[in-house]
Amino acid sequence: MAYSFTEKKRIRKSFAKRATVHQVPFLLATQIQSYAQFLQEHASVAQRKSEGLQAAFNAIFPIVSHNGLARMEFVSYHLSNPPFDVKECQQRGLTFHSALRAKVRLIINDRENPTKVKEIKEQEVYMGEIPLMTSTGSFVINGTERVIVSQLHRSPGVFFEHDKGKTHSSGKLLFSARIIPYRGSWLDFEFDPKDILYFRVDRRRKMPVTILLKSIGLTPEQILAHFFVFDNFTLKSDGALMEFVPERLRGEVARFDISDKNGKVVVEKDKRINAKHIRDLDAAGTKLISVPEDYLLGRVLAKNIVDPDTGEVLANANDELTEGVLEKLRDAGVKEIQTLYTNDLDQGPYMSQTLRTDDTVDQTAARIAIYRMMRPGEPPTEDAVEALFQRLFYSEDSYDLSRVGRMKVNSRLNRSEGTGPMVLTDDDILDTIKLLVNLRNGKGEVDDIDHLGNRRVRCVGELAENQFRAGLSRVERAVKERLGQAETENLMPHDLINSKPISSAIREFFGSSQLSQFMDQTNPLSEVTHKRRISALGPGGLTRERAGFEVRDVHPTHYGRVCPIETPEGPNIGLINSLALYAQLNDYGFLETPYRKVENSKLTDQVDYLSAIEEGKYVVAQANATVDKDGNLVDELVSAREGSERETRMVTPDRVQYIDVAPSQIVSAAASLVPFLEHDDANRALMGANMQRQAVPCLRADKPLVGTGVERTVAVDSGTAVQATRGGLVDYVDANRVVIRVNDDEAVAGEVGVDIYNLIKYTRSNQNTNINQRPMVKVGDIVARGDVIADGASTDLGELALGQNMLVAFMPWNGYNFEDSILISERVVAEDRYTSIHIEELSVVARDTKLGPEEITRDISNLAEAQLARLDESGITYIGAEVEAGDVMVGKVTPKGETQLTPEEKLLRAIFGEKASDVKDTSLRVPSGMSGTVIDVQVFTREGVTRDKRAQSIIDEELKRYRLDLNDQLRIVEGDAFQRLERLLVGKVVNGGPKKLAKGTALTKEYLADLDKWHWFDIRPSDDDVATQLEAVKEAIEQKRHDFDLAFEEKRKKLTQGDELPPGVIKMVKVYLAVKRRLQPGDKMAGRHGNKGVVSKITPIEDMPYMADGTPADIVLNPLGVPSRMNVGQILETHLGWAARGLGERIGNMLKAQAKAAEMRKLLGQIYNESGKVEDLDSLSDAEVLELAENLKKGVPFATPVFDGAHEDEIRRMLDLAYPEDIAKEKGLTASKQQVTLFDGRTGEAFERPVTLGVMHMLKLHHLVDDKMHARSTGPYSLVTQQPLGGKAQFGGQRFGEMEVWALEAYGASYVLQEMLTVKSDDVNGRTKVYENIVKGEHSIDAGMPESFNVLVKEIRSLGIDIDLERN
């Protein structure tokens, strides 16, 4: 196999037993593809599908005026180039967007002859701004990066459910059905406890369902015919003959003697009719059965019965037969009647009963009843009733099932076709009611709401389309109003369309929707996870309070689609999920997961993506099924999931139809980074997966020695590590940029064959962590497409590295690791292993005030020169200045109002001029508790205001950097061109040229080398072809130079034009401070297995427990943290990490001894190729093997994939290989090599038993004590209670609560208590008095009345009770 440029520098030994058939799909694909489909930016107008923007335009246009004479049609749209790139938008606080312009056509018809077109106007109209997605799947809105989270909502369609017997006290199941459209009114059908079927629209008042059926044009006869089968009777003078239908009689109790046609009694009265009786009746050829009169009584008529002679209606459908009715029928000579067949088991009389409760007569009455329910209090006119009914379910403008909804409705109602109209049809309503009645009759199953076939994902594109459509429909209303005037006032399309509603709808969605979230940017993993998040909350979704257990629970259909592990702890548990590693969305928005096809118990290479519904039809085996080398399933029974419940059963191999593609397919990206996940308890695994997202990037990233192999995927897909977009030769490298000369076969003709990668240097992330990229290539390196050429934050050689590898000992140590505390060695702090850089952004704005403009200046009165030392002449701090809390960073003065001057001030004014008193100092100072180094300053100036020197120098610097890039491109382009020219010209005969080149001479390399390159174009070749090629190259180079000059001018224009600042702001300065945070007691740390703790003490190296060879441990953890938490994965990681460290030491020793490459290959072969995945070490050259060894000497990195990791015997083998007997003895290892005899650093004595020691990857989490530590002397007070505010952000005090008061009472500390409740809290006069006393040097307290008592008095008075304080 071929290794990439970075992979071969440090190969990760994998213990995976199964070859990968299917690569992990691009992790941000769902976001990026969804938005690309929304924009369809690069598709030609003709090729655009009806989705996204195109669909929204198609739905709203054409817009026709009220009089029908004018209409506006949509032709096409296009997006302009964004005015600023992503970086500029972040700096200036702008939105990274593109202007949307639509070409529309206004058609006006002739008034006299409305069919004739009078005029057509076509014009391009501005339709607002559409935010663009960055290459990493986020959006820049007002300068901050945001993510639009996908939403999991209930799919449109029809659903059947019951109340599980909770509604009625009898515990009877009440069935209901609901038709949910994508947009429009919901239609519910429900049974009540009396078995009458009702419907309701949009959760309003319920009405009998027969009203709805009548309103769609069915008569009572037709309704009964749809829902019942009929019994046919022929009336006789006494009793009747009933048509014999065997299956209707079976199981019934005979209410009379039943005889066959010969008069022989087959069933006696009161006997139950069984199968034998029916066979006997059948055998006798029975067609009719004679029934007595009382058998007819109480039956229900199926049809209206009309007197054949007079036409009079004798009885209506759904009337009960009584003796009177029968007599009437016999008198009129009616012979044949039909009644409804019902029974208590599977043919209930529900619709018949419902029809009885319904008092509407016909279709019109039914529609009026519906109108009155929807619009109570409005008089129903015929037109209004008709319009409302049409708009409810039949109008495409107000009702849309969507493609998904139609597909779901058809499949649930058992129809074969998958498409149909996007509105409801009469058949949909009728079939839904039929299915619901069948459910009540005990036929069929209800739906499972939490099945992923009934929930679909709405991605960015779809959410944005809905908002855009909402904005566009507001525009439509305005356009409709004005279209009437278009002809008379001779208006153009742009006069009619106002883009404001569209812009505001889009802006509101991206800026403040619940699904538009501030991107979690702590480290690369948190970015990726945030973009792969799926939320059930948000508009149109669930709410935390109403969501029950079922929705939050893991469902069998989550397998391979949604991660069962990664979800937040707390109120959102189960509502916010993460996409599984291999999952993707299908066209309908349902989650799919890949499975490998199995045919005749043999695995094929075909991989199919199945949705939850499709998967229900197949038998799917687990990825850990035993397979021989030819891909055959060998076990007699294989564990597999089958049926709609997806229960795991043991099946024979021949029944297996699919198999999982990988063992890690059920978990998400974060959970798949936890090694030995299979040995951790699920609750701890959840914490481990979640805490990795909070790991702060350390100063020097350190790859995990024990990983899972997914680290590289996450690092590369997150966009943190820079990948080469095309292969080529590295031409130039410095800390800021990498220049690559692209391979000829990858370069596109006519474009620059140069790729320049500008690296991100010391940039602030959303969470104030530092993003910094470092190049990993040297000049002359050859890279291929997709190779990692620069590391970012938390990546090491292109692999995710969230923490540091630490030598961990599991043992108690003087109580310092009680309750999960962590004891850490001073060496870790001294080596800056956990030091992180945080970048704080501080900004100051100079505004126009009523009293005059604020000014940014160095000239501030009343400040000592020492305080201004860090400011330049413009009043802005230097880059590189080290600042402490309270230091001035930007000098600013604000004019203050004229006040009455004291004589002294007047004197000062007279001597020193005006300036002294009319301004106050409002400079930007470093906030309390912060110190650091200034690393960047940005100055923004409003259009029309002259720039200060500092702002100008920043612009010059930026332009210089841009010019460098252009020069590099030009240098490489010209270099390539002249190389090609040289190959073209050498050896060609010429007609003449510079330096007196004679006609007929052939060109040589030497001649060309002596000649200035631009003079090559003066050579006159005798071959015309060569001459034209020469001319073409000259033109191409000149064109390139011209293009570059234009690009430079464009950039200069962009930088020198004024900045868009909020109204009233003249100038804005942003200062970026880099703050170094070392590890200290109180910081939170964690492993990857949910083993979290707080640093309790940093111990000198000499006091730490050490090994026989003198190596001290880095961290001491409490062994009691493991058994009850059941996260044994951390112990296995520790053992394997210990082996990794030992192997690294062996390799390091061989390098020191200058071992030959062949010996090195032998050891590497033992490490890599004895078990697990085989590595192709022979493909590496000797130099590459030695470079690999150099990178391995700190430890050989292992990959133990989730559910397919290293086994106990493999860990033992690695330990044996790492620590041969002599080394083991020297280090004091036990026979198993998993434990070590440690010595106490303070006494030098050995501890009484061996200790588990090894290497664990530990993270420092983003809960730093520096951000939480806070102290207050005086500060702000609450207005009403006059008590200090709370919290660090408000510079608040510590709450002294009820229980603390009890504690002081218990101790009898009365004076302390009085002080706490009065002067230290809300005794306003007492507070000032204490201050005065301290100033005077008296340390006494005069406690007065606490303000909260006054509040209490006021509150009691507000109840109308007069209460007063008696003062004596």
UniProtKB/Swiss-Prot annotation:
It comes from the Bacteria. The keyword Nucleotide-binding does not apply. Its EC number is 2.7.7.6. GO terms for molecular function: DNA binding; DNA-directed RNA polymerase activity; ribonucleoside binding. Keywords: DNA-directed RNA polymerase, Nucleotidyltransferase, Transcription, Transferase. InterPro entries: DNA-dir_RNA_pol_bsu_ext_1_sf, DNA-dir_RNA_pol_bsu_external_1, DNA-dir_RNA_pol_su2, DNA-dir_RNAP_su2_dom, DNA-dir_RNAP_su2_hyb_sf, RNA_pol_bsu_bac, RNA_pol_bsu_CS, RNA_pol_bsu_protrusion. The keyword Nucleotidyltransferase applies. One of its GO terms (biological process) is DNA-templated transcription. It catalyses: RNA(n) + a ribonucleoside 5'-triphosphate = RNA(n+1) + diphosphate. Pfam families: RNA_pol_Rpb2_1 (PF04563), RNA_pol_Rpb2_2 (PF04561), RNA_pol_Rpb2_3 (PF04565), RNA_pol_Rpb2_45 (PF10385), RNA_pol_Rpb2_6 (PF00562), RNA_pol_Rpb2_7 (PF04560). It is an enzyme of class 2 (transferase). GO terms for cellular component: DNA-directed RNA polymerase complex. Belongs to the RNA polymerase beta chain family. DNA-dependent RNA polymerase catalyzes the transcription of DNA into RNA using the four ribonucleoside triphosphates as substrates. The RNAP catalytic core consists of 2 alpha, 1 beta, 1 beta' and 1 omega subunit. When a sigma factor is associated with the core the holoenzyme is formed, which can initiate transcription. This is DNA-directed RNA polymerase subunit beta. It comes from Ralstonia nicotianae (strain ATCC BAA-1114 / GMI1000) (Ralstonia solanacearum). The gene is rpoB.
